[in-house]
Amino acid sequence: MADDGKEFLLGSVFPEYNLAWRNDLTWKGLHLGFLLSGRIGGVCYSATQANLDLYGVSKASADARDAGGVLVNGRQLVSAQKWYQKVGSQSGLPQYYTYDATNFRLQELSLGYTLPRKWLKDKATLTLSIVGHNLWMIWCKAPFDPESVASTGNNYQGIDYFMMPSLRSLGLNVKLDF
């Protein structure tokens, strides 16, 4: 980012810490497992929000138009169109769309039951489980999932550019042991 010809760093896309807690509980054939994960630190950038603001189709730009403009530094009222065309452009203010990438989520939850061996004539063990992934974003400072990426290349980490929402999945596991 350049300011008066000098460059400054908005932050690193890499987190300071990645945390995870996995736990599995079993009682009388009933199984409960969960995975909580967290990412602390790092920054992410929303090119989606910048473009929506630039073209005047975001909620923020609509609210600013309805309010008669944008109050800059608490003193100067600037037209919403001029403000968002300036900050939303590629030469605008990327720090306006840069967010802390810290987030905590329930990454996985499973609930299962193992049928008693005698039900299968002591020949096998059958376990049935319901499993869910990416079930709950407990806390996130960015207005999007900072762990979603548009590309696996090194140059696109931490950038939201009209990405699809994070997928939540539910499934059924069947485990048969002989």
Regions found by a protein language model. Give the residues of each.
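Membrane-embedded beta-strand positions of outer-membrane beta-barrel proteins
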Residues: 34, 128-130, 174
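Repeated loop/turn-to-beta-strand initiation elements of outer-membrane beta-barrel proteins
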Residues: 29-34, 118-119
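Extracytoplasmic loops and strand-loop junctions of Gram-negative outer membrane beta-barrel proteins
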Residues: 1-9, 60, 89-97, 154-158
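Extracytoplasmic gating/loop element in the C-terminal half of outer-membrane beta-barrel translocons
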Residues: 39-127, 131-133
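Conserved small-residue
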Residues: 1-13, 53, 73, 133, ...
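Residues that define the transmembrane beta-barrel architecture of outer-membrane proteins
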Residues: 15-19, 102-107, 124, 166-170
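Outer-membrane beta-barrel pore domains and translocons
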Residues: 26, 37-39, 131-135, 177
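C-terminal beta-signal and terminal closure region of outer-membrane beta-barrel proteins
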Residues: 57, 67-75, 89-91, 139-178
